[in-house]
From Swiss-Prot:
Gene Ontology cellular component list: intracellular membrane-bounded organelle; nucleoplasm; nucleus
Protein known as: PSME3-interacting protein
Residues recorded as bearing N6-acetyllysine in the entry: K139
KW Repressor (keyword) present: no
Alphabetized InterPro entries for the sequence: FAM192A (IPR039845), FAM192A/Fyv6_N (IPR019331)
Composition bias, Basic and acidic residues: 22-39, 171-182
Length: 254
């Protein structure tokens, strides 16, 4: 009995009576009156019959919701315009960055200028120092050269050659300061026994006073035909004061 009653209820639900349809139509009309606009028709439109199964209709609703969700979180929909507060904030930040950059450039230029000025000062001081060092180094070299020349001339040897064959004579320093008074006269009378008559000895026109660096008094060759003669005077410090080179010229008396 119970099983038969359940079967009858299921069969009854499959069939809808005219009264139920009228009641549903009346309910839809009431709802339509609530949402109806002036341009809409007065009567509620009939429901469109959908021959699809329940599964297909549910699947369609699910797909529709998924599309709406994806459309909401797309990248192009996430981009939006900036409002006024945000633009003001960004302008302030950019202005502060420009000020900081400007200050940094000014500091760099100032440091470069100071560095160049210091380099110029150091360069000038180094040049002055080099000039002073050059002066200090040149003076000892000159004194050293003078002493070395004096030492070299102190041991110079003079060879005197004549027809009579005189011996070698070494130069010696003269203790007397007045050396010019010892210069011989312009002409001398030589009494040479080897010559037949009296003769007059006259000096040549070339007279050398002082010395040149690196030069000493050297005698001529020991040949008996050489008739040149040189005499020098050396003071107490070993420096030649005057040197007279003569050429023996023998003139017969008239």
């Amino acid at each position: 009995m119970d099983g038969g009653d359940d079967g009858n209820l299921i069969i009854k639900k499959r069939f809808v009576s005219e009264a139920e349809l009228d009641e549903r139509r009346k309910r839809r009309q009431e709802e339509w009156e609530k949402v109806r606009k002036p341009e809409d028709p007065e009567e509620c439109p009939e429901e469109v019959y959908d021959p699809r199964s329940l599964y297909e209709r549910l699947q369609e609703q699910k797909d529709r919701k998924q599309q709406e969700y994806e459309e909401q979180f797309k990248f192009k929909n996430m981009v939006r315009g900036l409002d006024e507060d945000e633009t003001n904030f960004l302008d302030e930040v950019s202005r502060q960055q420009e000020l900081i950059e400007k200050q940094r450039r000014e500091e760099e230029l100032k440091e470069l200028k100071e560095y160049r000025n210091n380099l110029k000062k150091v360069g000038i001081s180094q040049e002055n120092k080099k000039e002073v060092e050059k002066k200090l180094t040149v003076k000892p070299i000159e004194t050293k050269n003078k002493f070395s020349q004096a030492k070299l001339l102190a041991g110079a040897v003079k060879h005197k050659s004549s027809e009579s064959g005189n011996s070698v004579k070494r130069l010696k320093p003269d203790p007397e300061p007045d050396d010019k008074n010892q210069e011989p006269s312009s002409c001398k009378s030589l009494g040479n026994t080897s010559l037949s008559g009296p003769s007059i000895h006259c000096p040549s026109a070339a007279v050398c006073i002082g010395i040149l660096p690196g030069l000493g008094a050297y005698s001529g060759s020991s040949d008996s035909e050489s008739s040149s003669d040189s005499e020098g005077t050396i003071n107490a410090t070993g420096k030649i004061v005057s040197s007279i080179f003569r050429t023996n010229t023998f003139l017969e008396a008239p």
